[in-house]
């Protein structure tokens, strides 16, 4: 029933491969059938395949809905009686009892029907991809024993698509996982500023409920704060819990500070202690023993008010050594928790290192690091939605209680008690407005994949970027293998938003685990163990590239390892507990796609990882010559390629679909997505890469999507690059490009814009979509069909009509003559105004699609809307000056000049280079990876052959056999931290194959003699030449360049608006005025501040003078000066404007006969204010 909403099984395997034999083998053979043969420089065999990259989303959602697949995996883990997220909420809520306790309502067994419409239809018709949710509701009348059971509809529940996204009102959204402080008990250490004493404190933080804080102050007394109220001696709380002074002395007699606290405590007995606490918590209310007892119980010991959650209970038990190994049943505090916490704090303050709890368990006594990943957990999508459902259900609970008391007992059924509106509203509110439900980043497949794996510390219950300090943003040793230390945004969110590491997974408590190979007595075994950050701290871990022999033993007697808090040292191999599974274990997917990452500075690697997400899909994608081996898995898991579900033979292929005859005799047709618009206006297009008659295996890629080539992620193009200055045109990161890339559409991308218009009912009548538009010539209407909608294939530019629409105008007073004519000729056609949909300013393209939704065709439309038309306009954007290009190493730049091919520097065989980058962009930025990529790119393009006749050279000793020879245009991979070495690169450069003339163009140092394309003379020095992977980023000059003639003005100041969206002007600010003053350009400055800005009268007169060819009149008084006067007058200051002779001047409000006349003659609207769109401007 739910198979359509969730992904297939995770591709994770727990069996390790055998250790590498003495002669290296290439690890290029991918587990994906039909994958391109990318030869790899990897020296290590990875024992664990990369897990499903979307599992963090899909597994969590499956837990929420309690899917069969989740139940199977829970059973494999050994969970007894697993409970899904929805079941958990219903279990917590049930039973809802009325105020007398005579009636109760219970919920159980949540289940879903099939989804209402497929994903494509939901996107098309602005629907939500959702399935109806039903629960079994049982009403019990305790007085009569009567039970009424019904299946109740609880609203449409948004479902997750196969790609790990949600479709809400037609738009694709992603719910980001949230990093929060785990509930539990946290001990802290601070230095008192006045006495330099070390003070200790502890916070017991619940998932829901009041905080409990204990501390030792500078006077050496132990205090407690309940619910952040005033501090009291801790013995008051113990007495309130029923402890006598003798019991306190018996348990805490070892501690001097506890004895002194007890002496300073003036309360006697439990009752007095309870009343003392009540006065602090409820000041002003009359205290009674019963109310004080009830308050304390409700605060910490009742499940309705206080919830540590399972994870909080687990953390408290682990920290304090309580109930170790027992199943977690309760999620409230216990008296033993409070006592053990106080004892732990006292021992910590006294400098003890261990503590034995009553059960006989010995636990270490130490402070907690709040930024450690053992203390921070993930709220994944399932838990976030569950919390929102819990909010909706608690709102519904109040309604149910009220209805129980007001309705007739005999007539009550579950259906009459339940109002599902609060639940539906809570879910809608979460998906529509929560900070963690985000508009999906769909620039390219990688940006979507990274968005789903994002970890955010922001959002409700998290941090705020203003208050977050450096410590919480910093890289922590416990991030290793869990959160990428490289990929995070630049700017105010740095360190608060991260990305999940490649191999990381989330355990049932929400802690991030990472896999390790178990080491037993110095032998690396095949067993894979997942560890949380807490567990890892207790072990010694070796890195993945520690040399091991064929038996799995460490080659070196001492092994480099890391211990707790990131300490690194050499230890004997027998002391090693675990070993990393892969060198790329610490980085995220985007970072793992940067070749030679190990040679890049971290700041530039961060930019490289982020800029890959901004690459736009090109007309023809091209896989990188130099990859990292991550491209295939990233493309498949991103979900934009089409993958064969079962093995079979291709029966039929067209641009729109592929039909596969499966081996079991069934037939399956896969539909292609053709020229669809992504969330960011890029083009999502799928193309088959198989032919009729081909054999395909299950899991094989059969069609490419955007930014993929042969099933691999392909974000840019392999371009021949020369790294050299050229006449200063590539100064300051500017880039020089060959015109070949423009002419041959190498870096051309397609962008699709969606334009929408609706016809509504207005007070004056219904709007109408029509071709009959007043005062519009036939040439303008040439591309509109009989309905008034533009035809598909029409070329349109700014101002052209896409959809004709007329809106009724208010009836005007008729003259006697008009009344006479109307009486003679009958009813005159109603007056209408043109409100057509036009192409916005600065846009153009070709119409590629039209969707019409009409109430007559029974389409679902918002209230008051009769017809809705969407027009899709595609624009082919060639690369041009001002566009931004980037490599994968943070090497970004803007195109400064496009040179004719014949002017570009060329190699000795006449091959012109495609792109020239400046040498200055490398040394101080320390991203040497781009140079190594350029060298290896040249080797891959030209091919190589290592002469092994006299034996394999030393530099090639560690290379796999298939890397001793490569054909031209071979695709290679150099995995991060396990890629090609510098010596190997130098050796390969000396072994490159000659061109067809027998010449080797690039020397062993990676440099070539280049010739000036203009003169034909050689440059005086050899230049680094090779192939670099270059991406075209989403920062396109067409979206940014803008010019204004006349446009909208601000209503108050009458100054032009700003920004391209408002068709605004350029801001001439304070500093620009200073520049004008410095040059003495008085008249230019006066013009800028008056007639070009907010002199409302003057600008109309100037316009008239220009039209008539007369001299420009004197400027008047700016409107902003009048606004300033009004503001001063509003402060009760009498401000007058005086002439040079001291006479008061009356400022006119623009009622000038000449002005009105000029405006009428020229057709200028003087009341031009802010406008919703540029088309509305007169």
From Swiss-Prot:
The keyword Nuclease does not apply. CDD domains: RNA_pol_B_RPB2. GO terms for cellular component: cytosol; DNA-directed RNA polymerase complex; peptidoglycan-based cell wall; plasma membrane. It comes from the Bacteria. It is an enzyme of class 2 (transferase). Changing residue 148 to A: Does not affect association with TRCF, but weakens interaction with CarD. Changing residue 438 to L: In strain: vr4; rifampicin-resistant. Its EC number is 2.7.7.6. Residues 1-37 are annotated as: Disordered. One of its GO terms (molecular function) is DNA-directed RNA polymerase activity. PROSITE patterns: RNA_POL_BETA. InterPro entries: DNA-dir_RNA_pol_bsu_ext_1_sf, DNA-dir_RNA_pol_bsu_external_1, DNA-dir_RNA_pol_su2, DNA-dir_RNAP_su2_dom, DNA-dir_RNAP_su2_hyb_sf, RNA_pol_bsu_bac, RNA_pol_bsu_CS, RNA_pol_bsu_protrusion. It holds the Pfam family RNA_pol_Rpb2_3. Changing residue 451 to N: In strain: vr6; rifampicin-resistant. Changing residue 451 to D: In strain: vr5; rifampicin-resistant. DNA-dependent RNA polymerase catalyzes the transcription of DNA into RNA using the four ribonucleoside triphosphates as substrates. The RNAP catalytic core consists of 2 alpha, 1 beta, 1 beta' and 1 omega subunit. When a sigma factor is associated with the core the holoenzyme is formed, which can initiate transcription. Interacts with CarD, TRCF (Mfd) and RbpA. This is DNA-directed RNA polymerase subunit beta. The lineage of its organism: Bacteria, Bacillati, Actinomycetota, Actinomycetes, Mycobacteriales.
